[in-house]
């Protein structure tokens, strides 16, 4: 079962203790968009996790996103049943990244609009990715960003570990 109810600082400390790190927001997004198989987060029951219909506005790159979403009635994290590929990217817990919540590279707000990013309010927030078991499936996509204060524990926050690839000699 995924670890949840962690602050960013706790997630980062654990990752370092384990000899890993938290992924950056862009590493997380790259992994999520490149992972084609979208393995289901099986609950060990006959229930099939929800997935987004291809006509959904959140459906990207003709990929199906599956997970334990609000619509399944699974309102707690459920462990994956197989070890193939990336698991549980969507629908269990929001995963802390190592990235501050800032505008995307090249982002410029329209004149007079606060837009997605308001530097004054967002300057101390950290990005979470993936969605939780209480996030509606229609909100989930590999590019969806969430944010939270780094010192705050949240019942729907967790972590994913990353490790640098070995350097070629």
Predicted regions and their residues:
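Functional-site microenvironments in short loops/helix caps that host divalent-cation chemistry
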Residues: 1-141
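Short proline/glycine-enriched turn/loop segments at secondary-structure junctions
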Residues: 115-120, 146-153
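Extended alpha-helical regions
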Residues: 129, 136, 142-150, 157-159
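Short, structured beta-strand segments at or near domain termini in extracellular proteins/domains
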Residues: 153-169
